[in-house]
Amino acid sequence: NYKDALSASGNKGVTRHYPFVPGIDAAGVISDGNSLQFTEGDEVIVTGYDMGMNTPGGFGEYINVPVEWVVKKPDNLTNLEAMSIGTAGLTAAASVLKILESSNESDLPVLVSGATGGVGSIGVMLMSKLGKEVSALTGKSSSVEFLKSIGAANVIMRDNYLEAPSKAIERPLFSCAIDTVGGNVLSKMLPQISPHGVVACCGNVAGIEVNTTVFPFILRGISLCGIDSAESPIDFKNSIWQKFADEWKLDLSPMIKIVTKENLQQEIDLILKGGQQGRV
């Protein structure tokens, strides 16, 4: 996860005190505890909250967390599948649910920015699985075939997209969007969303500022919705895990890369440079 990379590289905005064990996602077996809710041997998942930020996280062999952070792993998910989904998958799923709640009935494509990242790639897969036409936005020309293989109908190169002239309100190009990057990409897409569409915003790697006008909101009734899966209520997280184990079951094998702890640093460097593809 991007937040893991920030913590591992000494970002005091994420982790205040070092040395520290990062990892905002974990899956494993209860070895000890004082809760009546779980017993020794139960297979569980923990994502988000303070874990991996200032509470030692999933890069360790053992973790000690409040019971309120813990979800029982669905039987139809392996630990590998659960961690291939992780916080990124929960964020993508929360974004998809927000879009599905909208009254937008356009048959225009759904735009997914940062589409090769963890949130973006799972967002592409989910939207495609739900029968939506997906336009994947990426800065990596080498990832076009990867994006098509996981469900993207169209791949848009980021530089070409950003170079095109912008207006305060434009011809609708997309029904809704999952934006994982923020900044100028988010600013660019807002005037292109069709009436009553939703933009689910969940990232800021392209910047924390958004340059827009009120026109997309008051002339088309679009909604810009913030997505924060880390602090979501545990019941909401549990419902998403059940979906991933059932009707939203995904074949994640094309997008995962397994490494040892000894090779973590090179993956941390890669994600900070925007070079990671899928989930590690």
Which residues does each predicted region cover?
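Glycine-rich phosphate-binding loop and adjacent beta-alpha segment
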Residues: 184-251
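Short amphipathic alpha-helix with an adjacent loop that forms part of the alpha/beta core around
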Residues: 161-172
